[in-house]
Every structure is written in C-alpha cells, then in structure tokens.
C-alpha cells in the first residue's frame, strides 16, 4: 500500500526486491533499508525471515507508510527518521539495501519536499549514490553486503570506482531495461542535450550493485 505523497513500488523496487530475496536472510540477519518509502523492501526482508529490520527515510510520511505496511503484513520493522545513514551507528548491519533518488536533474539544488525528492538527485544524478557509497563501510558489519540500485543515466562506472575506493568488492548482479516513466519522458529532452540519451531512446537501464565489506575489515 502506498500513501499519498510516498513513492510507490515500481519496476526499480521490484528489481531490487528480487535481488534482495536472493541473499541468505535468517532471523538474526540485521537488515537496513535506506530511503524506505512505503517499506516494500523492509517488509520483503522481514517476510523472508529477518527479525531485525531497520527502515530509514527523511520523510515522516514514508515512515508512517512503512509502519502501516509492516502491520498489514504481520511483521515488525524499526522505522527511523533521518537523512540516509546519519542516524545510524557503526558496523551494525549485515545487509543494506537502497533504491535512492538517482535521476539527473536540471541543477544541483535538491528538493526538500514533494514527490520530486524521491527521484531528483542533482545534475549528475549522484547526490545520494555517492554518499551511500562513501558511508556504506561505516554501517556495514564485516562481511556485510550492500545492494544498491541505480540507473545507467547516473554513471554506473562512477559507482563501481567509488565502492572500490571505499575498500568494498563490487559487482553488478541484476539488470533490467524498462520503458520511460513520466519523469524521464518529461526530462528526456534535457538528458539528450547532455548526451545521456541517444535520439529516440526510450528505455532506461537499471542495475543493482552488490558490494561486500571484507570480513577482516573494522
């Protein structure tokens, strides 16, 4: 269930959920969902067996939606208000999932409210991706896994480099090609001007990175 003003589950959500369910999830697996939205991924992890799921979102409305969906599905989720990983401690999570905003925007000023906050990610689409890549080693337990979804429009190679720079091993484990939704349809002209889209291109490539913190890392 998606409440008014909360990003509803879409193709990117489902791609990441399928990838998440390919990971070993046990009752003691500590799972974190960054940018939880409706809580679809958090609920998926809890239904898969984790009894220790944390959902974080900057929007209080999203956290209410997450709590509601947890109740409707008979699972318990700790919903935390905060900006990405800021409210979280160190080395706490075995599995981190995130479907952050990743759509390149006209400028670098990020929305502070409204649905656009769910997809606008600065001029290069990397405002949130780069932060998650940099902060993941701090919140992951040794041997922990990050599953991070993004669009090819927001520079796949940059994510690979940044994850490796942070000492994580990283690879793409899931991909999908999806038709443009309303946001990319409206923004296609701008993205073509920047050389991010070819003339007539109307499908978006999505990828999921799987990044692992070494078992011996602090």
What are these regions (language model features)?
Residues 1-48, 59, 86-87, 186-217:
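SAM-dependent Rossmann-like transferase core, predominantly class I methyltransferases
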Residues 5, 126-184:
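Conserved Class I SAM-dependent methyltransferase catalytic core
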Residues 50-51, 144:
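A short helix->loop->beta-strand "cap" motif at the edges of active sites that frequently abuts
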Residues 52-57:
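Conserved SAM-binding motif I beta-strand of class I
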Residues 66-67:
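Conserved SAM-binding loop
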Residues 74-84:
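Conserved SAM-binding strand-loop segment of SAM-dependent methyltransferases
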Residues 85-96:
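A short acidic, Gly/Pro-enriched loop at the edge of an enzyme's catalytic core
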Residues 100-128:
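Mobile active-site "lid"/loop adjacent to the S-adenosyl-L-methionine
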């Amino acid at each position: 269930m998606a409440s008014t003003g909360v990003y509803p589950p879409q193709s990117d959500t489902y791609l990441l959920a399928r990838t998440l369910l390919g990971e070993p999830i046990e009752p003691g697996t500590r799972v974190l969902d960054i940018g939880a939205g409706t809580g679809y991924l958090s609920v998926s992890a809890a239904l898969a067996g984790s009894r220790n799921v944390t959902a974080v979102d900057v929007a209080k409305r999203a956290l209410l939606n997450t709590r509601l969906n947890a109740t409707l599905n008979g699972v318990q989720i700790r919903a935390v208000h905060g900006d990405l990983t800021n409210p979280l401690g160190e080395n706490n999570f075995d599995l981190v999932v995130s479907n952050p905003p990743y759509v390149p925007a006209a400028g670098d000023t990020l929305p502070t409210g409204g649905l656009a906050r769910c997809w606008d990610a600065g001029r290069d689409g990397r405002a949130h991706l780069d932060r998650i890549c940099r902060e993941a080693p701090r919140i992951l337990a040794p041997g922990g896994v990050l599953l991070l979804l993004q669009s090819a429009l927001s520079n796949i190679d940059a994510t690979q480099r940044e994850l490796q720079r942070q000492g994580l091993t990283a690879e793409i484990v899931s991909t999908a090609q999806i038709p443009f939704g309303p946001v990319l349809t409206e923004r296609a002209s701008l993205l073509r001007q920047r050389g991010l889209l070819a003339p007539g291109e109307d499908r978006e490539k999505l990828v999921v990175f799987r990044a692992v913190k070494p078992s011996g890392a602090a």
